[in-house]
Every structure is written in structure tokens, then in C-alpha cells.
Design a protein with these regions (language model features):
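Conserved SAM-binding loop
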Residues: 132-133
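N-terminal auxiliary segments of SAM/dcSAM-dependent transferases
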Residues: 1-55
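Conserved class I S-adenosyl-L-methionine
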Residues: 92-101
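Conserved SAM-binding loop and adjacent beta-strand
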Residues: 67-80
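Conserved small/polar residues in nucleotide/adenosyl-binding loops
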Residues: 138-140
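Conserved SAM-binding motif I beta-strand of class I
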Residues: 118-123
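Conserved SAM-binding loop of SAM-dependent methyltransferases across substrates and taxa
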Residues: 102-114
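Conserved alpha-helix/loop element of class I SAM-dependent methyltransferases that forms part
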Residues: 77-91
Length: 140
């Protein structure tokens, strides 16, 4: 899953889900089906097949991290700042991350790095390696 085509599907300010927008795809909820072809722009309010309204919008970085599928424990946004300060990490850093895990920290590091910076991330788990590749990170 990458941020490029990911949206939040929200009902009643309670039920939030991440979904990947693809033509001719549907998002199935307990309140009906949402057809992605019906979404013309973002943000948008769309009606499910059972006449329930959903808000569809591009997620904030924090929403993406908190709603993304997890394998291992994620590093929460509130902890990322402490890691950046302790590691003296800035946009010009070259980073070697040992233990990609869910990719939450990797994703944030990728977001802040300058184009000339490099981010190397290693994980012994093939599943975590595939998860990082799906995030479409540009510095890896």
C-alpha cells in the first residue's frame, strides 16, 4: 500500500478504514458497497449501495500510520519525534535502519529526507521486506 492512491473511508466520525483507490473496484462495508468509480474528486461524500453516507479523503500521515495494516508493533507518531531528536536525524541525513518492521518509521523518514539523502532499511523477515517495498518509498 502506498500513500499515492490511498484514501480514508469514514462514517459518522467513528469508523475509519484505509482503502486503495483502483478503477472498477469496490469497498465493502457493513452498510453497503462503495464503488470507487463513483468518486470523482477528493475529498468527497459518497453514498453506499444501502444509502449510507461516507466521507472519502486523502489521509494525513498520522492517519495512514495508525490505520495501516500491521504485522509487528508500529512506532507511533508521538514517538517518532523523540527518535529524530535522539538520532540527530534531519533532511540531509543518510540513514541505516535495522528492523524495518511495519514500516511506519521508515515511511516517515522517507517523507522528511532530501532527494540526495539515502535510507537503507534491513529486516530479516521477508514479510516485512515486502511490506516496505509496497510503501513505494523513494529513498530506499
Amino acid at each position: 500500500m502506498s500513500l499515492d492512491n490511498t484514501v480514508v473511508v469514514l462514517k459518522n466520525n467513528k469508523n475509519k478504514h484505509l482503502a486503495v483507490l483502483k478503477d472498477d473496484q469496490e469497498f465493502v462495508t457493513q452498510n453497503g458497497v462503495i464503488k470507487f468509480n463513483d468518486i470523482k474528486e477528493l475529498p468527497s461524500v459518497i453514498t453506499s449501495s444501502n444509502n449510507h453516507e461516507y466521507h472519502v479523503y486523502i489521509p494525513s500521515f498520522e492517519e495512514f500510520i495508525l490505520l495501516m495494516k500491521r504485522g509487528p508493533q508500529i512506532i507511533y507518531p508521538k514517538d517518532i519525534g523523540s527518535i529524530l531528536i535522539a538520532g540527530n536525524i534531519n533532511k540531509n541525513s543518510n540513514i541505516l535502519e535495522i528492523g524495518t518492521g511495519s514500516g511506519a518509521l521508515t515511511l516517515y523518514l522517507n517523507l522528511i529526507l532530501d532527494k540526495e539523502s539515502q535510507l537503507f532499511t534491513l529486516d530479516e523477515s521477508k514479510r516485512n521486506q515486502r511490506r516496505a517495498q509496497k510503501l513505494s518509498l523513494i529513498h530506499i
